[in-house]
UniProtKB/Swiss-Prot annotation:
InterPro entries found in the cross-reference section: YcgL-like_sf, YcgL_dom
Superkingdom: Bacteria
UniProt xrefs under PANTHER family: PROTEIN YCGL
Disulfide-linked positions: none
Name of the protein in its database record: YcgL domain-containing protein Smal_3906
Domain YcgL positions: 1-85
Organism of origin: Stenotrophomonas maltophilia (strain R551-3)
């Protein structure tokens, strides 16, 4: 499976993977609006041995097959901060 990756210009570190270049027809209109302009950044073959920096290739393939796209969002800030216990 092949994916085309686009970066949101409104949401930092947010990317959309689609199976066809420049085809955002599977994205719900409110989501597309909230992302703003999308800039092409990469085309990638989603092979079993392929590693992605911030996403699981199996999940990307599954969501693209099921929904027609995969949305990669940054990890929440709270998940990056160490937990403090009293």
């Amino acid at each position: 499976m092949h994916a085309y990756v686009y970066k949101s210009q409104l949401k930092p570190d947010t990317y959309v993977y689609v199976p066809r270049r420049d085809d955002f027809s599977a994205l719900p209109a409110p989501l597309l609006t909230s992302l703003g302009a999308l800039t092409f950044v990469l085309d990638v073959a989603l092979e079993a041995r392929r590693r992605l920096a911030q996403a699981d290739p199996d999940k990307v393939r599954s969501e693209m097959n099921e929904r027609g796209f995969y949305l990669q969002v940054p990890p929440s800030v709270s998940s990056l901060m160490p937990r403090h216990y009293d």
